[in-house]
């Protein structure tokens, strides 16, 4: 777990190196939300429905808004997540990502990003239909 937390902190630091002092705008398409990082070759079917597009000048607010939107969704049936939830002894973390990959420690990245000044986890969500 310590190595994962360290990796997530480094990821935030590398992101800061890219955006610090430069104008930037970020767009996230929250679709085909897989159980593992997109970089994993062994990925499975999406665990959540497609949510939409998010955009912000603050990359951290954007990430937090995307996470929050995902956590409000009902997991897709017959996905790795719902299969795990149906198993006897399932430990519900009340977080789709922690339920799918408990050791990912994704919140560490967001917390560290805020601590080092990439942006704020606070946001105002404006919905456009």
Regions found by a protein language model. Name each.
Residues 1-129:
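Extended, low-polarity segments enriched in aliphatic/aromatic residues
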């Amino acid at each position: 777990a310590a190595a994962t937390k360290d990796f997530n902190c480094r990821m935030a630091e590398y992101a800061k190196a890219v955006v610090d002092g430069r104008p930037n705008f970020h767009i996230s398409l929250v679709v085909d939300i897989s159980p593992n990082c997109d970089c994993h070759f062994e990925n499975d079917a999406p665990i959540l429905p497609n949510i939409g597009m998010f955009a912000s000048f603050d990359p951290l607010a954007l990430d937090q808004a995307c996470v929050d939107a995902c956590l409000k969704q009902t997991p897709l049936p017959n996905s790795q997540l719902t299969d795990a939830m149906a198993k006897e002894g399932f430990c519900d973390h009340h977080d789709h990502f922690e339920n799918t990959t408990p050791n990912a420690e994704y919140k560490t990245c967001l917390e560290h990003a805020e601590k080092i000044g990439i942006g704020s986890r606070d946001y105002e969500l404006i919905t456009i239909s």
